[in-house]
């Protein structure tokens, strides 16, 4: 019984990895059908539906992976790092690095892969970015407690500006067909971004 469960879990992971790879390829800029996905995995469409009731559920699973990866690591950054600017830098670098290492999933983060899918999926990505923005804002608000001095500009404005930088770099990565990596020249870009944090 345990072997059967493991085989089923492995097949599910194989399906999700194939979907992510298809999103990374030139197919990712077009609608991915279950027929194409089944062919990529080497199974029938019926076999896909034994593991996932719908393609939407496959995207849900990929979004869950994105959420878990980013939120878990953000929490680790907040636990380990106490300096506000360093925290913000590490969170931005985390988002950009995650996108760079997972090009197919970046198409989901930017919404490109979800254009032909249910609106609910885009809503989940919107909620993820809202959670990250709230976290950035909280980090900024804690600066006054931790360091004795807050920002002169509104934290809501600063957090949205920081997140817009991340979204812009991820969008550029997708638009360039993954040529312009989000972390390219990060060490030169970060001082420009950090200078806005006043």
Curated annotation (Swiss-Prot):
GO molecular function: DNA-binding transcription factor activity; transcription cis-regulatory region binding
Domain of life: Bacteria
Subcellular location: Cytoplasm, Nucleoid
GO biological process assignments: cell division; negative regulation of division septum assembly
Entry keyword set: Cell cycle, Cell division, Coiled coil, Cytoplasm, DNA-binding
Subunit structure: Homodimer. Interacts with FtsZ.
GO cellular component: bacterial nucleoid; cytoplasm
Residue ranges the record marks as coiled coil: 119-144
Protein name: Nucleoid occlusion factor SlmA
HTH tetR-type domain residues: 10-70
DNA-binding region ranges: 33-52
Family matches, as PROSITE patterns: HTH_TETR_1, HTH_TETR_2
Keyword Cytoplasm annotated: yes
Function per UniProt: Required for nucleoid occlusion (NO) phenomenon, which prevents Z-ring formation and cell division over the nucleoid. Acts as a DNA-associated cell division inhibitor that binds simultaneously chromosomal DNA and FtsZ, and disrupts the assembly of FtsZ polymers. SlmA-DNA-binding sequences (SBS) are dispersed on non-Ter regions of the chromosome, preventing FtsZ polymerization at these regions.
The family this protein is said to belong to: Belongs to the nucleoid occlusion factor SlmA family.
């Amino acid at each position: 019984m345990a072997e059967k469960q493991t085989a089923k879990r492995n097949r599910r992971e194989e399906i999700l990895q194939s979907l992510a790879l298809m999103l990374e390829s030139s197919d990712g800029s077009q609608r991915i059908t279950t027929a194409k996905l089944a062919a990529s995995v080497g199974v029938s469409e019926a076999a896909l539906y034994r593991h996932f009731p719908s393609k939407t559920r496959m995207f849900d699973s990929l979004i869950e992976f994105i959420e878990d990866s980013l939120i878990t690591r953000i929490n680790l950054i907040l636990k380990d790092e106490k300096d506000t600017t360093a925290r913000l830098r590490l969170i931005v670098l985390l988002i950009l690095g995650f996108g760079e290492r997972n090009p197919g999933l970046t198409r989901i983060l930017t919404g490109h892969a979800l254009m032909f899918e249910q609106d609910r999926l885009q809503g989940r990505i919107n909620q993820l970015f809202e959670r990250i923005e709230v976290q950035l804002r909280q980090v900024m608000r804690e600066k006054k407690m931790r360091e004795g001095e807050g920002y002169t500009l509104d934290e809501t404005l600063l957090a949205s500006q920081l997140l817009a930088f991340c979204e812009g770099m991820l969008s550029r990565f997708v638009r360039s067909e993954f040529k312009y990596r989000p972390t390219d020249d990060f060490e030169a870009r970060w001082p420009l971004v950090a200078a806005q944090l006043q």
